[in-house]
Amino acid sequence: MELKTGFGSSVSLLLAEGDKPEKRAVEELKGMMELEETVERMKVCGGFFGKPDSTFRKAVVTPDFHKGAGIPIGTVMMTEGFVIPQAMGNDINCGMRLYTTDLREDEIRSSLTSLLPEVRRIFFEGGRNIPMNGIQREAMLREGLTGLLETCGEAENKGIWGFYDRDVQERELNYTAFHGSVKADDTEGLRDFIGSPHTLSYDDQIGSIGGGNHFVEMQKVEEIYDGQTANAWGIKKGGILIMIHTGSLTIGHQSGRINQIITKSMYPRGVPHPDNGIYLLAQPGADVRDGKESAWNRFWNTTNNAADFGFANRMFLGLMMQGAVTGVLRPHEMKLLYDSPHNYIWKKEIDGQDCFIHRKGACSARGMEEMADTPFAYYGEPVMIPGSMGSSSYLLKGMGNQEALWSASHGAGRRLSRGEAIHGNDREFQAFMEHFHIVTPIDPGRNDLKGRSDILKKWGESIRSEAPYAYKDIHKVVKVHETHRMAGPVARMEPVFTVKA
């Protein structure tokens, strides 16, 4: 399906057959594409672009396309000579992390009455225990997982660091996009977060899930579709996996605010500002006196601070789950299959030109050729597509479809807004809750909460906003990936229990 933009181009909508795109999302997409007019305006006024061939090259939307904030979720754009900071959202390096384990379903289910309280304690009741000093936090923000690897001795195995194995973490860099490290030369605006260089302290960010559709979930492999790939990746029917979905939280939102200040400061004076509020940041050219290089470097530094935090946050959430399960059951094997962002800007050379792939709520789905010199060279990039809370999730392998800008969905995509979902079908919601195991900061079964209808009402609304009926059918979404040769299914998973903040 092609959507004409009114500016001489079109956007490819890779949607399920018969799936009518959300009207509000389509209107938002049309408004977003007014940025083509902004590009032409910048060319006419002169001096804005540092590269002579700067252009907007292509846009597609993935099957989980739905309304966002200015730019729809599921949007992928390719530009040359400039970036669009808003096109990766503010939760920079929101992404997915997936572990295989040697755990068995029977031992998990038989221990839920003791395991779920321990998970709640570690995630929400003061058991997180991730002490870090300023040296570590700065290394994390500048170099991501590599920075933590180089400074892990500072914490002396305290708290969750007791589950941090340096050799394992070094090996897992090969199973993480960008090796878990996108370099930054500065930590603008983050001095208070970093803290004292040599004093161990705690913060309320690292090891946090965040709100919305973020989660940590223990899953059972229900069905295998590609036996060869599944075997190579350690995926077995009935096996237990741990999937993590979160990002850079407050760090990312602060970086997003700084990036908006940077982009607006570089907008030419006397030129009408874009009606859609979407600004461009030009890549610097040969003339370094025009301030473009400084703005460009600031942008990438603050973006990469957040991205590096996102990688570290998902890693620590994995260690926290490992700690909870080990404390109740037994020491167990956890192997990282892959960690991949779905809110970021990728640099890619195409036809000899440096281009930028912007993904907002869309993940990379490179094929075998693009994954050469990685552990996935013979299969394609792992793609994790979770369904709504309580429904199936899928593991796929990327097929490197250039028409889809080497991209795939990052989820099922909303069908109802959060407000609409809160007023969903009561009977359907109750049936869902009867068999669904969820861990949240609030335990609704606590005796002291039975008389607090206000707290329980708010808790129920937060769960309803993410209930299955609020999202599109994940099976149809995955089928579109097959049809358009974006990614091929490897396995389907079902939740055992879910952790939501």
Regions found by a protein language model. Name each.
Residues D64-F65, N93, T101, T246-G247:
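An acidic- and aromatic-residue-enriched active-site/binding cleft used to recognize and process polar
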Residues E2-G47, S54-V60, K67-M77, F82-A87, ...:
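Domain-length cofactor-binding catalytic modules of enzymes
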Residues E105:
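Patatin-like phospholipase
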Residues F82-G89, C94-D102:
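N-terminal cap/recognition module
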